[in-house]
Amino acid sequence: MMMMGDSFGSIGSSMASLFFLWATIQQIFPDHLKITIKEFLLSSFQQLCFAQRVSDHFTNLFSPYVEIHFPESDEYSFNQAFSAIDTYLDSKATDKTKHLRGSQVKESKGLVLKRNEAKVRDEYKGANVWWERVVDNDGNRYYKLTFHNRARTLITNSYIKYVVEEGKSIIVKNKQTRLFTNNLSTQWVFGQNMWRSIEFEHPASFQTLAMDPKKKEEIVNDLIAFSNGKEYYKKIGKAWKRGYLLYGPPGTGKSTMISAMANLLNYNIYDLELTAVKNNSELKKLLTATSSKSIIVIEDIDCSADFTSNRIKKESNSRERYGKEDKDENSVTLSGLLNFIDGIWSACGQERIVVFTTNHLEKLDPALIRRGRMDMHIELSYCTYEAFKILAKNYLDLDGDDAHPLFSEIKALLEETKISPADVAENLMARNQQIDVDKSLNLLISALEEENQYQRSQQEKKKSKFKIFG
C-alpha cells in the first residue's frame, strides 16, 4: 500500500509540475511555439504509468486547441479535399516555409518550388492555424489542422471552405493532363496506389487528325457539348458521362483520336488494362478511384476479355464445366463491365468519358456496344483522299486540291487501294529532317501501287478458290 501511495504521489507531483509548466507556457510563448511545446509535454506525460487513453482524455479536457483530420482517401474513393489542401499549402510555400524543394517541369526553363516541410502555419482573418501532413502506422496519409477553440466557427464555417476552393482553382489553372494505368491489386496499399501516372504530352489535335472534316467537326461538337452539359444531364436525370466506340483496322488513328480528345477537353486518361483486374469487385474499386474530367479507355476490348458474340455459345456448350468456373473470382464478367459503364456505380463521379476501341466490331457482344451505352460509334477507316490532304498539309505544307500535280494520281490510287493513314504518313515523313516534296509523294505513289497490286492478287486467289469449291 505504501508503494502504491508513493507511486500515486509521484504521478500527482508530475502532473502538478506539468500543469504549472503549461500555465507558464501559455503566458510566455507565442502561439506557433505553443503547439510544439504542447506535443513535447504530452509525449512526456504519456510515458507515465497512466494508459494512453487517460492521456487522451486529459488532453481533450485541458487543451484549448481543436484538431480536424483530412484523410487522403475514404473507404471507396479518393478524398478531393486532400489534394485541394495539398495544392493550397504548396502555393504558400515561398511565403510560409523555410525549407523548399525545386523541380523542373519538362520543356520549361523555370523551377517549380514546393514545400519540403510537413508543417505549415497559416493565418485567416486574424486566426492562426497549423497544418501538418501525417503518415500513420498503416501508411495512410492525412492532413491535421490545429486551431484555437475560440476560432472554431470561423475555421469550420469559412476557412476550410476557402482553402478547398482556392486549392481546386489552382489545380484547374495549373492542370497538367496525365496518363494513368492500373496497378496489379497486389501492389495496392490500403485502398491506395491503384493507379500510377505520368505527364501526358501527346501533341495530337483534331486539326492534325487525318479524317473526313465533316465527321471530325461532328465529333468535336459532340465532345464540347458534353463538357458543357452539366445542367442538361442534371435536367434529364442521367449521369454526366458519355461512351464512344472507336472501330476500324489497325493504324487508322484510334489511339490518336483518344489523345486528341484529351487535349481538346484537358481531361486525364485512364488506360484500363482489364487483364490486370482479377474480378468485378476490383473493377468497381478502380472506377471509384478515378477523377472527374477523365477519359477511361479500354483498348482492343475484343482481346481484353471474353466479351465477344461467341460468349453465349461457349457458355451453353460447357454448362457442366462452367458450374465450377462460375464461382471463380479471378475474372471480370460482362455484367460486371456493363455495371462499370452505366450501372449505379458509374454515377459515383462526374464528367467522365468511356472509350472502347476494337479492330473487329463484328466480334463484340451487342449488349456491350448498344446505343445508349456507347453513345457514339466512330468508324476510323482506311485513308481517303480528304484524309490524305490533311496529312499532306501536316507533313509537306501542301494545302488544297491543286497543291501539287501528283495529287490527282494519288487520289485515283486511294480510291481503289486500302491503306491506313499511318502507312501514308510514314511515306510522307521527312527523312533526315529535310523535306523533299516530290520524293515523298513519289514514295507514297510507289507504296500505293505496290499495295494495290498485292490486294488485286489476293482477290484473284480468292476468286480461283471460289471457282474450285464452287
From Swiss-Prot:
SUPFAM superfamilies assigned: P-loop containing nucleoside triphosphate hydrolases
EC number of the protein: 3.6.1.-
Pfam families xref list: AAA, AAA_assoc
GO cellular component terms, semicolon-separated: plasma membrane
Heme listed as a keyword: no
GO molecular function, one term: ATP hydrolysis activity
Annotated signal peptide: 1-30
InterPro entries: AAA+_ATPase, AAA_N_dom, ATPase_AAA_core, ATPase_AAA_CS, Mitochondrial_chaperone_BCS1, P-loop_NTPase
Keywords: ATP-binding, Hydrolase, Magnesium, Nucleotide-binding, Signal
Needed cofactors: Mg(2+)
GO biological process: response to stress
Catalysed reactions, semicolon-separated: ATP + H2O = ADP + phosphate + H(+)
Family: Belongs to the AAA ATPase family. BCS1 subfamily.
Protein name: AAA-ATPase At5g40000
Organism: Arabidopsis thaliana
